Each structure stands twice: as structure tokens, then as C-alpha cells.
Amino acid sequence: MPMLRYQELNLLQMLDVLRGASLAHLALSDGAQPYVVPMAYQLEVRGGEVLLHLVSPEEGRKIATLRRNDRVCLEIDLPACAWMDTVLVEGRATSGMAEPGRAVEVVVSVMHMSGRRYFVQMT
């Protein structure tokens, strides 16, 4: 049976994961139904503030859900050969208005972040 162990990541390690990965899983709450979508993102660190920039079409379930509930969670993985680093981000999302037919920028302001490095041993 495989054995799983992990160690907590510090802030610098978590930021390295966010810089090294390019895909996040964005979790939203659509009423009583969870809704998760993969999204590309861009990291911005401004002083002590961490922001994640996402781009989305202006119409659709994702933007409609964000307009009703701005609290989000993102899960970002950075796999390696012997381990996998994972960062969970909790925050609030804001979206701008777009011109018709244009993409909307969604900015997630990070309120809480945690990270782990997972090691799996096959026994």
C-alpha cells in the first residue's frame, strides 16, 4: 500500500510554486453546488499583497457565479519526480466590465494561502 507524507511549505516556497505553475483550478460556489474550472493565471506580488490575474469570457456560468459570490478558492500544483507541491489560495475575486465580445479580467486578492509538499512512497 502506498505511504503518503508531507511537509508544510513556507511563503517563499508557495510563491515559487505560483511562479512555476501556469494552471489553477478555480473553485466557486454556485448556490449549493460547487463549481470547479481550470484556468491559466498570472501572479502579481505588490508589496505584501498577492494577486492572481485570470481571464474569462464575459458571458457564462463562471462570471455569473462570481457576480453572486466573490469568495473563491484556487488549487495550484507543481509536480516533480519524487514529490508534488500544492498551494491552496482563498480570496475574493473582482471582475471588470468588458467591451462586447472581449474577455474579462478577474483579479483574485489572496486572503489566505497554505502549501504542502507531498511525498508518495510505494511499499
Regions found by a protein language model. Name each.
Residues H25, E49-H53, C73, V107, ...:
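General beta-strand recognition
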Residues A21-P57:
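Short beta-strand segments
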Residues M1-R19:
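Extreme N-terminal tail/first-helix region
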Residues E58-V104, V110-H112:
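Short, structured beta-strand-loop surface elements
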Residues G31, S95, F119:
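Short, electropositive, low-hydrophobicity segments enriched in small/polar residues
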Residues R117-T123:
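Short, charged, intrinsically disordered terminal tails
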Residues R19-A21, P34, T86, G101:
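Short solvent-exposed loop/turn micro-motifs enriched in small/polar/acidic residues
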